[in-house]
Design a protein with these regions (language model features):
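Acidic, glycine-rich active-site loops and adjacent beta-strand->loop/helix elements
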Residues: 27-33, 61-63, 94-97, 117-120
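General beta-strand structural signal in soluble alpha/beta enzymes
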Residues: 23-27, 57-59, 88-92, 112-114
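Short Gly/Thr/Asp-enriched flexible loops that form oxyanion-binding sites at enzyme active sites
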Residues: 6-11, 96-109
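Short, acidic/small-residue loops that bind anionic groups at enzyme active sites
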Residues: 24-27, 104-128, 135-137
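Solvent-exposed alpha-helices and their adjacent loops that cap or buttress functional pockets
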Residues: 16-18, 47-51, 80-84, 104-106, ...
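N-terminal phosphate-binding or glycine-rich loops at protein starts, especially the Walker A/P-loop
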Residues: 1-37
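Short glycine-/acidic-enriched loop or helix-start segments at secondary-structure transitions
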Residues: 35, 100-102, 123
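Glycine-rich oxoanion-binding loops at beta->alpha junctions
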Residues: 33-91, 127-143
Length: 150
């Protein structure tokens, strides 16, 4: 997931420097909100992550607090949000992530969405990060196949 650590680092450092915010990273996305898994992030915690692959917080693509095994656990997630003292949620992901994140706004949790998808299918975005990476990998694979086919 190229770019995720860059976003985490940028958001963390910007919030600390501009407003003196206390930043909390939720591990494994919405699953971490359900499982109550988080960690504090500061400039030191994100200092060397730009060149690391993946993401320091981990990812999870299938968790939905509004339908966790058919049960809406969003009230428990919001209780955890209040315990952590979160003022906002920065969600990094594609259309699924954004549609889930958007449902927290009426519950009192402002959301900032960072578009990340290889599909490049999010409204109001020209190009999402993840898309260029996918195109580059496909182009490289096609070039290798062409060489092999000769």
């Amino acid at each position: 997931c190229p770019g995720l650590n860059a976003v985490i680092r940028g958001v963390t450092n910007s919030l600390i420097k501009t407003v003196g915010a206390r930043v909390t990273g939720i591990e494994r996305g919405f699953m971490g909100m359900i499982e109550r898994r988080s960690r504090p992030l500061d400039s030191e915690a994100v200092a060397g992550i730009l060149n690391q692959g993946g993401t320091i917080l981990g990812t999870h693509n299938f968790a939905n607090p509004f339908s966790c095994n058919g049960v809406d656990v969003s009230d428990k997630v919001m209780e955890y949000v209040r315990e952590l003292g979160l003022d906002a949620l920065v969600a990094i992901g594609g259309d699924g992530t954004m549609s889930i994140a958007n449902r927290f706004t009426p519950l009192g949790l402002p959301v900032v969405g960072v578009p990340k998808t290889i599909d490049n299918d999010l409204m109001h975005t020209e190009r999402t990060f993840g898309f260029d990476s996918a195109v580059a990998i496909v182009a490289e694979a096609l070039a290798r196949l062409e060489t092999t086919a000769r």
